[in-house]
C-alpha cells in the first residue's frame, strides 16, 4: 500500500502498528494476491494523497469502492476517465446543475474536487471485483473513523456532506461545533427523489465556508475527460 507524502502521513502512521491495522494489512496482502481487488494498490489512499489534512474544506463520505473493472481509483463516487458515469454520480451531477447551474461533465472523474479541498473518502477503501461490501468489517472502518475523528479535532472549520444512512452513522464522530454537517438521502436512483434532489449541498457548503472566511470550493468540473 502506498506511503503518503503530505501532512496525513504522521496521522496515518499512528495507525500502522495497531493490531487491527496489522490484521487488515495481512488480509489485504492475501486478497490482492489471490483475488481481483479494487482499486489498484497504489490508488488505495488517493483521497488522502490528493487532499492534504490542512487543505480539507469539505468531506464527501462514500461507502466502499465501485466493484466493476476500471472504475475505482480511491475517491468516493469518482470513476476514471473513459469509464461510464455510474447512476449515483449522474444524480450528483444533476443536483450540481440544478444547484449551481454548472454543465454536466461527460465523465465521472472527480480529481478536480479533491484538489479543491473536497476529501472524497469511502469508509471502506477496498473491495473484491463484483462483490460489494466484501471488505466490510476487515478493519477499514476503524481506520477511516480515525480519519474522521482527526478532522473533527481540527480547529479550522469544514463541512461534512453525509448522503444516506451509512454516511449519516458517522455523524456521532463529528462533535466539534466549528464544523457544519449537511445531510440528505443518498444520490442513488433508489433514493435521490426522496430528498437528495433539491437539497443544494454545493451552494450550502460554499455559503458556510464564505460565512467563516474560507475561500469557496469551485465545484465546476471540466466537461471533457481529456485531463
Curated annotation (Swiss-Prot):
InterPro entries: UDG_fam1, Ura-DNA_Glyclase_AS, Uracil-DNA_glycosylase-like, Uracil-DNA_glycosylase-like_sf. It comes from the Bacteria. Pfam families: UDG. GO terms for biological process: base-excision repair, AP site formation via deaminated base removal. The active site is at 64 (proton acceptor). The keyword Ion transport does not apply. It catalyses: Hydrolyzes single-stranded DNA or mismatched double-stranded DNA and polynucleotides, releasing free uracil. The keyword Cytoplasm applies. It is found in: Cytoplasm. Its main location: cytoplasm. GO terms for cellular component: cytoplasm. Its EC number is 3.2.2.27. One of its GO terms (molecular function) is uracil DNA N-glycosylase activity. Keywords: Cytoplasm, DNA damage, DNA repair, Hydrolase. Belongs to the uracil-DNA glycosylase (UDG) superfamily. UNG family. HAMAP family: UDG (MF_00148). Excises uracil residues from the DNA which can arise as a result of misincorporation of dUMP residues by DNA polymerase or due to deamination of cytosine. NCBIfam families: PRK05254.1-1, PRK05254.1-2, PRK05254.1-4, PRK05254.1-5, ung. This is Uracil-DNA glycosylase. It comes from Alkaliphilus metalliredigens (strain QYMF). The lineage of its organism: Bacteria, Bacillati, Bacillota, Clostridia, Peptostreptococcales. The gene is ung.
Amino acid at each position: 500500500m502506498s506511503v503518503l507524502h503530505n501532512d496525513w502521513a504522521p496521522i496515518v502512521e499512528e495507525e500502522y502498528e495497531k493490531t487491527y491495522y496489522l490484521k487488515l494489512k495481512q488480509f489485504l496482502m492475501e486478497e490482492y494476491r489471490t483475488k481481483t481487488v479494487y482499486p489498484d494498490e497504489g490508488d488505495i489512499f488517493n483521497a488522502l494523497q490528493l487532499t492534504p489534512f490542512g487543505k480539507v474544506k469539505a468531506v464527501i463520505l462514500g461507502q466502499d469502492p465501485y466493484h466493476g473493472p476500471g472504475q475505482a481509483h480511491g475517491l468516493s463516487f469518482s470513476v476514471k476517465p473513459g469509464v461510464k458515469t455510474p447512476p449515483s454520480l449522474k444524480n450528483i451531477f444533476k443536483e450540481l446543475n440544478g444547484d449551481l447551474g454548472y454543465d454536466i461533465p461527460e465523465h465521472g472523474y472527480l480529481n478536480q474536487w479533491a484538489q479543491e479541498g473536497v476529501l472524497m473518502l469511502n469508509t471502506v477503501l477496498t473491495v473484491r471485483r463484483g462483490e460489494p461490501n466484501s471488505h466490510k468489517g476487515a478493519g477499514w472502518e476503524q481506520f477511516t473513523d480515525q480519519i474522521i475523528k482527526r478532522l473533527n479535532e481540527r480547529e479550522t472549520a469544514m463541512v461534512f456532506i453525509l448522503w444516506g444512512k451509512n454516511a449519516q452513522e458517522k455523524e456521532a464522530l463529528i462533535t466539534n461545533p466549528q464544523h457544519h454537517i449537511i445531510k440528505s438521502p443518498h444520490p442513488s436512483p433508489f433514493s435521490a427523489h426522496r430528498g437528495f434532489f433539491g437539497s443544494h449541498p454545493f451552494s450550502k457548503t460554499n455559503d458556510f465556508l464564505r460565512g467563516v472566511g474560507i475561500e469557496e470550493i469551485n465545484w465546476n468540473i471540466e466537461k471533457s475527460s481529456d485531463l
